[in-house]
Amino acid sequence: MSQGKIVQIIGAVVDVEFPRDMIPRVYDALKLDENGLTLEVQQLLGDGVVRTIAMGSSDGLKRGMTVSNTGAPITVPVGKGTLGRIVDVLGTPVDEAGPIDTDKSRAIHQAAPKFDELSSTTELLETGIKVIDLLCPFAKGGKVGLFGGAGVGKTVNMMELINNIAKAHSGLSVFAGVGERTREGNDFYHEMKDSNVLDKVAMVYGQMNEPPGNRLRVALTGLTMAEYFRDEKDENGKGRDVLFFVDNIYRYTLAGTEVSALLGRMPSAVGYQPTLAEEMGCLQERITSTQTGSITSIQAVYVPADDLTDPSPATTFAHLDATVVLSRDIASLGIYPAVDPLDSTSRQLDPMVLGQEHYDVARGVQSTLQKYKELRDIIAILGMDELSDEDKLTVMRARKIQRFLSQPFHVAEVFTGSPGKYVALRDTIAGFKAILNGEYDYLPEQAFYMVGSIEEAVEKAKTLN
């Protein structure tokens, strides 16, 4: 095992000199002899010097300190022992519950599955959230992005999806907290503990206060654990269906930008790293379903300044099967979840996958809302009275649909005081179909706000009169 000496320290970037015949490879993990700090090799500068990123605080480091090459990339514990535990980017437990009970470990840098190992599926994943199930349905083994600016509800939507899917889903889940608030990580842990599903979830945290190296690699640590669960075969030779939650994929990009600047690379558009597309591809191509098992991934994506054309969210779009776009305009109307029904998309929105009835209702809802959007300018200038009877009917139904797309969440019960609702897909389709057909034209639009099924709207209308 070769040893080197630190020759330069600039923030999280540490240069180490090794003997010329024992230079480590890119992505090898180096360990500082004094305090065990891990450094990951990023560049070979020549003359035996390698440039590394510290996976922890570089406070107190000085030139001349001895560093040992481990000869392998960062490896993390995997398997059943990680369930119910919180680990950091290096797989070290941070929940004060003792060492992790597993003898298996895996390197965080792995190749994506080969083309002939991949498997495609059209099976739907019911979430119990009306607007998602109807307009941007999720595929089992697919990739979903929750796009939104600051404070429109990405994390709350993510928590509700975890609540509805992870609890009903008998498989295992991995949650990677990438550069998010420590408080949210704490809330998530207690949410899982209170609902007795902690033994089915592995948690990997690299939060906002961590150095950029940790935030850049923590998503790979979580993914490595999820891949192991997917590929581990049971006695019948089958793998598992795993859920992989990432909050937030933008912070992964941001950490890459910080590391890139520290390494002295020339920035590209808007100051992002020149390797943005490649880094995103390396992560996203590994999140996939094979013939052994599947990974269904749900990723929160922060949109800087609500600009969806920003390079970071724009690069993420290309990899996803469904996009759930959260809108500040809809949130300002008090409609939660603030999903934009006209901007959100899904590859599953196809009559061959969903069936003709679901497809027709979804398209009917979208066309009614689109017509209302076009009429709003006329209403603002001339008022409702100038519209034709047909347009008045469209506006009335669209406003009911808009309110019926809202729903009380289980995870928000503490704040709203109204109990959360899980709405089955067949009830969602039946409710919206009835509104489109005019069966509930006689009900006031307030009756449709923050209810679950259409029957609840009818009951609510009785209390309004």
Swiss-Prot record:
A molecular function (GO) term: ATP hydrolysis activity
Gene3D superfamilies documented for this protein: 2.40.10.170, Bovine Mitochondrial F1-atpase, Atp Synthase Beta Chain, Chain D, domain 3, P-loop containing nucleotide triphosphate hydrolases
An example Gene Ontology CC term for this record: proton-transporting ATP synthase complex
Entry keywords, A to Z: ATP synthesis, ATP-binding, Cell inner membrane, Cell membrane, CF(1), Hydrogen ion transport, Ion transport, Membrane, Nucleotide-binding, Translocase, Transport
Keyword Magnesium (UniProt): no
Top EC class for this record: translocase
Keyword Transport: yes
Chain residues that bind ATP: 148-155
CDD domains tied to this protein: ATP-synt_F1_beta_C, ATP-synt_F1_beta_N, F1-ATPase_beta_CD
Pfam families on file: ATP-synt_ab, ATP-synt_ab_N, ATP-synt_VA_C
Summary of subunit composition and partner proteins: F-type ATPases have 2 components, CF(1) - the catalytic core - and CF(0) - the membrane proton channel. CF(1) has five subunits: alpha(3), beta(3), gamma(1), delta(1), epsilon(1). CF(0) has three main subunits: a(1), b(2) and c(9-12). The alpha and beta chains form an alternating ring which encloses part of the gamma chain. CF(1) is attached to CF(0) by a central stalk formed by the gamma and epsilon chains, while a peripheral stalk is formed by the delta and b chains.
Reported function: Produces ATP from ADP in the presence of a proton gradient across the membrane. The catalytic sites are hosted primarily by the beta subunits.
NCBIfam families: atpD (TIGR01039)
Entry protein name: ATP synthase subunit beta
UniProt source species: Neisseria meningitidis serogroup A / serotype 4A (strain DSM 15465 / Z2491)
